[in-house]
Amino acid sequence: SFNLTLSYNPITTTCKPDDLLITLDSIPVSQLPATGNKATINSKQGDIILRCKNLLGQQNQTSRKMQVYLSSSDLLTNSNTILKGAEDNGVGFILESNGSPVTLLNITNSSKGYTSLKEVAAKSKLTDTTVSIPITASYYVYDTNKVKSGALEATALINVKYD
């Protein structure tokens, strides 16, 4: 008699995002638009970079479906697209992908959903082990009465969801 042991270790694709810092050039308060508008100057593009591991075969295929989206706890109340730059300022930020505003998942209230920045189907062939997603940040005025000079900062998390 003999013992036979079989092990199955499935390869599961994972993609880890790099940190991304987008720093906008300063803008004079006099050049900010009216409430409800994004500034048309000093926008800046950055690239979300995903580094993928465990791709299948020589064609670098993914083993499962992936979806990339952003989430934040710095969203303006009742908005899923405007990031507050500071609690006491009427200027924040808006992020865009392919020319359209990005809907971020609200970490404290996830009911409104989010924009999928990138979807990769299972068995997709990646030309490289990295995936790049361009994103543009702009100043956005949400309350003209509270606009003042000063530093602004907002944070969003890059999420990769697998199915």
Predicted regions and their residues:
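Mature extracellular/passenger domains of Gram-negative fimbrial/pilin and adhesin proteins
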Residues: 1-163
